[in-house]
């Protein structure tokens, strides 16, 4: 499960996206918070998210008195990074759109780019949706300190906004793909 609030610990499982050239790799990360508020993370890779959260902790360690607070900080940093990824995909979509509307010949490579962007956008959206589920589960939990809940509500708004942006990019890609296929069809009809 993505989130489990058991008697002796809270467990949360997430996927973190890591850009690899024009696509992403998905790396699983698990968090466990004991009843004493100790946070343990289990991961196979190093992430910018953890380095950034560590910097925040070092600058203001009093604000991170429990593993609950540290987990929320990690999720905040990750949501910021997810926003960067959504923005990056949006720029790639805009570049493909510009390429198609430039009037240059549309070939299979353009269609492959569109397809790859659709896949990346869909995976990114699913990943952000998973984050939304975890945040909603934490919001329903009664075990987190009360001072965390206002931050959670803001984080959920941010995640909802990211989902909307990812949806827009996906819809735009559908439109771009339709336009590209239409232009290819026109080119083929002119040849005939």
Which stretches of residues belong to each language-model region?
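Membrane-associated alpha-helical segments
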Residues: 36, 102-192
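Short, charge-rich amphipathic alpha-helices with coiled-coil/heptad character
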Residues: 58-69, 97-104
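Extended, Lys/Glu-rich alpha-helical coiled-coil stalks
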Residues: 76-79, 94, 98-108
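Alpha-helix initiation and N-capping motif
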Residues: 50, 67-68, 107, 132
